[in-house]
């Protein structure tokens, strides 16, 4: 497989799996302090439930004040935690723009006409074959006869068109997965395996 195609696939994998960095950011921004406060409140609340306000008024009142303090602390720490996670995700989004989106877009423009594979000439109407070979620009220039077909018995499929088709397929699969995940998580997991095999097959081609 051509080096440029492998590079495009690498960018594609990075683009489609970048959302995992958000999960990683959530894990790295440890909510340990928040969890500790929540556990403390749960334990104190259980203790408070077992006390009688009449028989243990002083302790019951003290626990109530402590619960109020814990509620405020939990709200403050949760807010700080969520802000920290969002700030990390924003930095990751900027990083993606620099290391994935911009280079990937530039590469697609630079190598968009690179032949990926060939189809027998005559399989599709001339207009479609011209688009497969020259990309979307052919649609605008075809009436002017400014784009010519390559000689031979086959029509080369350009990298830009191949990538467009692959992204459309992946987008459709992602939509189906999201729909299944909402309806049946187990079915979504099985479909995800099919998705992985499809991506592997595309890489092999």
UniProtKB/Swiss-Prot annotation:
Lumenal side: 1-3, 118-156
GO biological process, one term: vesicle-mediated transport
UniProt entry keywords in alphabetical sequence: Coiled coil, Endoplasmic reticulum, ER-Golgi transport, Golgi apparatus, Membrane, Transmembrane, Transmembrane helix, Transport
Keyword rRNA processing: no
Primary location group: endoplasmic reticulum
Segments passing through the bilayer: 4-24, 97-117, 157-173
InterPro entries assigned to the protein according to its UniProt record, in alphabetical order: Get1, Get1_fungi, Helix_hairpin_bin_sf
Ranges facing Cytoplasmic side: 25-96, 174-205
Gene Ontology CC terms: endoplasmic reticulum membrane; GET complex; Golgi membrane
Entry coiled-coil feature ranges: 32-96
The keyword Lipid metabolism is assigned to this record: no
Membrane topology note: Multi-pass membrane protein
Cellular localisation: Endoplasmic reticulum membrane; Golgi apparatus membrane
Similarity remark: Belongs to the WRB/GET1 family.
PANTHER family: GUIDED ENTRY OF TAIL-ANCHORED PROTEINS FACTOR 1, TAIL-ANCHORED PROTEIN INSERTION RECEPTOR WRB
Subunit note: Component of the Golgi to ER traffic (GET) complex, which is composed of GET1, GET2 and GET3. Within the complex, GET1 and GET2 form a heterotetramer which is stabilized by phosphatidylinositol binding and which binds to the GET3 homodimer.
HAMAP family in the cross-refs: Get1
Task of the protein: Required for the post-translational delivery of tail-anchored (TA) proteins to the endoplasmic reticulum. Together with GET2, acts as a membrane receptor for soluble GET3, which recognizes and selectively binds the transmembrane domain of TA proteins in the cytosol. The GET complex cooperates with the HDEL receptor ERD2 to mediate the ATP-dependent retrieval of resident ER proteins that contain a C-terminal H-D-E-L retention signal from the Golgi to the ER.
Protein name: Golgi to ER traffic protein 1
């Amino acid at each position: 497989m051509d080096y440029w195609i492998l590079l495009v696939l690498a960018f594609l994998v990075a683009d489609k799996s970048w959302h995992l960095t958000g999960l990683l950011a959530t894990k790295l921004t440890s909510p340990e302090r928040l969890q500790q406060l929540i556990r403390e409140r749960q334990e104190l609340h259980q203790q408070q439930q077992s006390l009688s306000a009449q028989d243990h008024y002083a302790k019951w009142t003290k626990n109530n004040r402590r619960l109020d303090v814990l509620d405020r602390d939990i709200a403050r720490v949760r807010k700080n935690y969520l802000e920290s996670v969002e700030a990390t995700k924003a930095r990751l989004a900027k990083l993606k723009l620099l290391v994935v989106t911009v280079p990937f877009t530039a590469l697609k423009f630079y190598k968009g006409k690179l032949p990926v594979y060939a189809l027998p000439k005559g399989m599709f109407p001339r207009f479609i074959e011209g688009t497969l070979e020259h990309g979307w620009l052919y649609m605008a220039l075809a009436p002017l006869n400014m784009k010519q077909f390559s000689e031979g018995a086959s029509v080369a499929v350009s990298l830009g068109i191949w990538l467009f088709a692959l992204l459309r397929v992946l987008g459709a699969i992602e939509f189906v997965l999201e729909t299944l995940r909402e309806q049946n998580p187990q079915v979504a997991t099985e479909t995800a395996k099919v998705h992985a095999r499809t991506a592997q097959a595309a890489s092999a081609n």
